[in-house]
C-alpha cells in the first residue's frame, strides 16, 4: 500500500502572512510555484494559489495571465490589467489566501487521499505532521508519478 510520503513533494516554498502581493508574485514567477502555504507565528494558516490571485474579488486581472497546469503564461499587458494589478499590490498574503484546503499525514493511504482530492474537488493536499508543513501533493505530482 502506497502512502502519502511515497509521492509528496517536499521541495516546498512557504511564505509569511504579511508578505506583500508584489513579493508573492515575484516568488511565484521566479520559482514557478503555484501554491504557497502561508505561515503565521510558526503555524499554517492558509495557502496562496495562482487562482486566489486571479479571482481576487472585483480586482482580479482578466487574463493576460493564464494558468495551465503548473505553468503561468503571460499574455501582452494592457492598461486595464496594469490598473487592476496596481490595486492588488496593496494586499498581503493573509488578505488573499485560501483557508479551505485538504490536510493529510505522511502515513495516510495514498488511494484514500486521491479519493478525497477528487471527490472534494481539491487540486492539492498539504502534508502536515506535528503542526509542521512537510510537503504537498498536487494533481500534477500524481500524474507525473503515474508516468515515471
Language model feature labels by segment:
Residues 1-27, 31-33, 38-40, 44-45, ...:
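Bateman/CBS regulatory modules and CBS-like beta-alpha motifs in cytosolic regions of diverse proteins
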Residues 6, 51-52, 95, 141:
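Acidic side chains
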Residues 29-32, 52, 61, 121:
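Residue-level detector of secondary-structure transition/capping positions
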Residues 46-51, 135-142:
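Short hydrophobic beta-strand motif reused across regulatory alpha/beta modules
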Residues 54-70, 143-148:
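A short, polar/charged loop-to-alpha-helix boundary motif
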Residues 63-64, 117-119:
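Alpha-helical structural elements
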Residues 120, 124, 138-147:
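Gly/Ser-rich helix-loop-strand patches that form or flank binding pockets
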Amino acid at each position: 500500500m502506497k502512502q502519502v510520503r511515497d509521492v509528496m513533494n517536499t521541495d516546498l516554498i512557504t511564505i509569511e502572512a504579511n508578505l506583500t502581493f508584489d513579493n508573492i508574485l515575484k516568488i511565484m514567477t521566479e520559482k514557478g510555484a503555484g501554491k504557497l502555504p502561508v505561515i503565521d507565528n510558526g503555524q499554517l494558516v492558509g495557502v496562496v494559489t495562482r487562482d486566489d490571485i486571479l479571482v481576487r474579488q472585483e480586482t482580479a486581472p482578466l487574463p493576460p495571465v493564464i494558468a495551465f497546469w503548473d505553468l503561468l503564461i503571460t499574455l501582452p499587458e494592457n492598461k486595464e490589467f496594469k490598473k487592476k494589478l496596481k490595486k492588488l499590490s496593496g494586499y498581503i498574503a493573509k488578505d488573499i489566501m485560501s483557508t479551505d484546503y485538504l490536510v493529510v499525514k505522511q502515513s495516510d493511504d495514498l488511494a484514500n487521499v486521491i479519493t478525497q482530492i477528487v471527490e472534494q474537488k481539491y487540486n492539492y493536499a498539504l502534508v502536515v505532521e506535528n503542526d509542521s508543513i512537510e510537503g504537498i501533493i498536487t494533481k500534477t505530482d500524481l500524474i507525473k508519478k503515474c508516468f515515471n
